Amino acid sequence: DFFTLPENTYYVLEKDNMLVSAARLSKINDFYYLEALETPPKYRKKGYASELLNEMITHLHQQGSVDIRDCVSKTNTASLATHKKCGFFIAEENGIYYPSNTVNNKTYGMRYFIR
């Protein structure tokens, strides 16, 4: 289940008391790993994932510098566009799933970085 992993930070965006987007972050060494960004199908293409990412970035930046990494499927054009719109860039041709330190050649390693 999305919200059951211990030692993670969760961000939730609600509209009219309905969950429209959620993100799960893991702190790994000196960066955050965006392990999941979920938007239910009926709420997609409304800008909710971008809104949530921007709010998350703002919150993290208020605490200091921000270094967020993520893996996004090379075929998920919507998620790639959302990440880029929010300031992420492709840092690695093959994504790294940091919790297990495994490389996935079907994903890009995305990164958001600001000091």
List where the protein language model places each region.
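A generic structural signal for beta-strand entry/edge sites
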Residues: 29-31, 67, 96, 107
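Short beta-strand-to-coil "C-cap" segments at the C-terminal boundary of structured domains/repeats
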Residues: 100-101, 111-115
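Conserved GNAT acetyl-CoA-binding A-motif
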Residues: 60-72
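Short hydrophobic/aromatic beta-strand or adjacent loop that forms the aromatic wall/cage
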Residues: 8, 105-111
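Conserved catalytic-core motifs of GNAT/GCN5-like acyltransferases
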Residues: 71-72, 89-106
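Conserved acetyl-CoA-binding loop-helix of GNAT-fold acetyltransferases
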Residues: 39, 45-58, 81-85
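Acetyl-CoA-dependent GNAT
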Residues: 1-35, 40-41
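A short, internal acetyl-CoA/4′-phosphopantetheine-binding micro-motif in the GNAT/acyltransferase core
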Residues: 37-45, 72-75
